[in-house]
Amino acid sequence: MKALVEFRKKNKKDLYTELLQLLREQFNLRMQSVSGKLKQPHLLRKVRRNIAQVKTLLDSKEEIK
């Protein structure tokens, strides 16, 4: 929930940069998972949830304008 509150404070440009960062992080976690080196598998779910939250906020900010 804390991340969602922080995401809501950001403008669209910051949300896009956050989305790119999260997508890169998701890619890196997937590569670690495939190679068997992922020590914290719960991070995949957390990053995926954050990506969904950012995309939802971006869509809602687009509808407002």
Swiss-Prot record:
Annotated SUPFAM superfamilies: Ribosomal protein L29 (L29p)
Domain of life: Bacteria
Family: Belongs to the universal ribosomal protein uL29 family.
Source taxonomy: Bacteria, Pseudomonadati, Pseudomonadota, Gammaproteobacteria, Enterobacterales
A GO term for molecular function: structural constituent of ribosome
Signal peptide segment: none
Keyword Ribonucleoprotein: yes
InterPro entries: Ribosomal_uL29, Ribosomal_uL29_CS, Ribosomal_uL29_sf
CDD domains cross-referenced by the UniProt entry: Ribosomal_L29_HIP (cd00427)
Gene3D superfamilies: 6.10.140.1970
GO biological process, alphabetically ordered: translation
Keywords, ordered alphabetically: Ribonucleoprotein, Ribosomal protein
Name of this chain's protein: Large ribosomal subunit protein uL29
GO annotation, cellular component aspect: ribonucleoprotein complex; ribosome
